[in-house]
Amino acid sequence: MKNKLLKHTLYICICIVISILIEVLYFNYNAIFNNIPSENIDFSTTTQDGNAVLNLNLDSQYINKLIINYDATKDIEYSLRYSSQDLFGEEKENIIKDIFDDSFNTSTTNIRNYVSKIAIEYASSEATNLNIRSLETDNDFQFNLTRAFSIFLVLILFYCLIVFYKNGFKTEKFHIYFAVVGTILGTIIILAQPSSTFYSYDDQIHFQNAVDLFSIGDTTYSVGEYHSTEANVANSAGRGSVNSIEEQQAQNNLFDSGSSTYSKTVKFAPTYNKIGYIPMSLGYHLAKFANLPFSICFKIGKFFNLLFYILLIAYTIKTIKIGKRLLAIIALLPTSIFLASEYSYDPAVFIGLTIFIAQLVNLYLDKNTKFDFKTAVILFASISYACFVKAIYVPFFLLTLLVPKEKFDTPKQARLVKAGTLALTILLSATFVLPTISGTMESDSRGGSTSVSGQLTSMLSHPTDYIKLLGNTAVAQFSDKVSQGFDDLSYIYNEAKRSSSNFFYILLILLLFVSITDNTGNSLSKKHRLSILIASLVTSLLIWTALYITFTPVGDNTINGVQSRYFLPLLFPLLICLQPKNIKNSINPRLYNTIILTIPVIINIITIFTSIVAVYSY
């Protein structure tokens, strides 16, 4: 035991040393060995096509960071264009979109390249709102603690994979492997991202709900809360303009500076659909109660959301009778880990529906599993948790009606459970249907000229036309929704300048391979497969319909607002239906488990470092 502890401690120390060496010798190579000085840069201003253009006077030279010192009376968008050589010596033009944020007076952009020319463009009409005081390069040595710690965590992650392999990489311990890998990957995301919103879907709304959940009475928002919620959605400091570790620090200094002038009265009204905010709200308010700076509180709220996701999915992987490894891979998709590390209630839906499906599958397959009180609580609580957040997943609850009668102690118990299932299904459906019919459900103004009552009237007046629209739209957009769903990092990709399909085919092949080969000898009957497929199809149609009602202009011939993440909870129930009865996996379990877990780990690391760490923490 002592030898193992000593060995692990030694490797951790080695990882620390290696991460420091990489940070110092690789990322600061030019500062140490080429001694390239930092300097002020002269520039000239011209106009072109209605834009003011700042041309920097420089020779072909290495620039690590470009610093623009300015004064702005409003947020002003600008483009930074620079020419550099690629690996083949060919000159290429690079374009970086950024903002002169009026909350700050310095913009720091990572170049990290030899450049021959740089031009900065912004609308000429904004000239009276902007004064460029000076431009300079920063080629000095910089020890970036966030980057170094991220590298350290990656080294620890690979060491864990080595330890798992040496210990046999046992299938029955896959929940532990998932928990370790998921926690490390999510932690890197949380640490590297700025402590603000507008990086994942609607996170400013989710963060505000998390802040308000445990707030009662007259509440004054802190500066960070004010800039990170819907309260100041139009002019949030740092929104879309944090592109370096220096700008992160400037934003943190502002957000940690105390209270804002914005206050509101928060009434304690615990509605059922707020249940998904409890983990992140609890973490945030505990940190706030401890008087920690906003930038730290913000990350702790995210970490609680991640931890809740990891613990419950790990529990599900441990207890489910089939598809352990398949569930782990789905839960480790870049989209899954990213959303679990954000202010988002999408993980709540995934957790609730996955636990429900796992418990139901155990009832279908395991002869020793009875429908006892514990099983009933897990089933009813998990599906309610998912549907309280988003009621459109309620069709899955009807699968409880297919539990074999021999699972119940008495016929009376079976009748009570089925009656309770129908009653709760109606109740959960009512949380969505009644507000829609009564007109109390609000449409989403972001969709344009939307109206719930108006859209319903249009649909009921032209039911055949809507059915055609629904079918045509779902079929036409199916491939896009699938291809965008595996490694979609929301608004992060706008900053990283890349699409969300870089690893789609690798992940698709991996998921199909694991769904077919993760076979323990048990598989669902045709009846159960068909029922799950029908529930998935009905839920998918409800997703499209819900967005047509709430997010699409009345009478429009398309359906707006449907995003791939809404279908992520359906992935596991759909793929377990593909598990064959007659195919036996003869691959060595240790080798098989190593391969299928290492692939998503590598993809996540590449995705996180190229799209998050390199964009926000360099």
Regions found by a protein language model. Name each.
Residues I216-I300:
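Interfacial juxtamembrane loops and adjacent helix segments
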Residues Q359-N368, V394-I426:
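Perimembrane helix-loop-helix junctions
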Residues M1-I32, Q142-I189, V417-L424, L524-I532, ...:
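Start-transfer (signal-anchor) and selected internal transmembrane alpha helices
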Residues L292-S295, A314-T335:
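Transmembrane-helix signature of polytopic, membrane-embedded enzymes
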Residues D256-S260, V433-N519, Y618:
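Membrane-lumen/periplasm interface segments of multi-pass, membrane-embedded glycan/lipid transferases
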Residues C13-N34, E172-D203, V211-Q251, L422-G439, ...:
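Transmembrane signal-anchor helices characteristic of membrane glycosylation enzymes that use polyprenol
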Residues V163-F164, K299-I322:
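Transmembrane-helix motifs of polytopic, lipid-linked glycan transferases
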Residues F338, K374-A391, F396-L402:
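Membrane-interface alpha helices of multi-pass inner-membrane proteins
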